[in-house]
């Protein structure tokens, strides 16, 4: 299993209850595709560089997951179908990117 960063931008106008429903759906989707969440950074509402669906802000969630197979195809394509999900980005986490070489 490899480690990936899963970054999501959600609709910024979600209530706390709707946000919890979206988080539960995301985690269920990850589990159903054989991924395990190792870390969740709930960044919250942030201003975006350009509007997405006429919104200047987005609610950011950044997951670190361990998954096998092709999470871009399996997980991201499923999450993109949700109405409240504005953007999905899956990036393979490589340890050599985190260490600075002199």
Swiss-Prot record:
Signal peptide residues are: none
Which Gene Ontology molecular-function terms are recorded? small ribosomal subunit rRNA binding; structural constituent of ribosome
Q: Name one Pfam family in it.
A: Ribosomal_S6
Q: Which InterPro entries match?
A: Ribosomal_bS6, Ribosomal_bS6_sf, Ribosomal_S6_plastid/chlpt, Transl_elong_EF1B/ribsomal_bS6
GO cellular component annotations of the record: cytoplasm; ribonucleoprotein complex; ribosome
Q: Which UniProt keywords apply?
A: Ribonucleoprotein, Ribosomal protein, RNA-binding, rRNA-binding
Q: Which GO terms describe its biological process?
A: translation
Query: Which cysteines in this chain are paired by disulphide bridges?
Result: none
Domain of life, per the record? Answer: Bacteria
Q: CDD domains in the record, alphabetically?
A: bS6
Q: What family is it from?
A: Belongs to the bacterial ribosomal protein bS6 family.
Query: Do you know which HAMAP family this protein is assigned to?
Result: Ribosomal_bS6
Q: What does this protein do?
A: Binds together with bS18 to 16S ribosomal RNA.
- Recorded protein name is Small ribosomal subunit protein bS6
Q: Which organism is it from?
A: Deinococcus geothermalis (strain DSM 11300 / CIP 105573 / AG-3a)
Give the gene symbol.
rpsF
């Amino acid at each position: 299993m490899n480690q990936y960063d899963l970054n999501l931008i959600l609709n910024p106008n979600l209530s706390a209850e709707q946000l919890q429903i979206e988080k539960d759906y995301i985690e269920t989707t990850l589990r159903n595709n054989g991924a395990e969440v190792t870390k969740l950074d709930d960044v919250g509402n942030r201003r975006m560089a350009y509007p997405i669906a006429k919104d200047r802000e987005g609610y950011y969630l950044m997951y670190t997951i361990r998954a096998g197979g092709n999470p871009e195809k399996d997980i991201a394509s499923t999450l993109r179908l949700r109405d409240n999900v504005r953007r999905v980005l899956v990036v393979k986490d490589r340890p050599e990117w985190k260490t600075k070489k002199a």
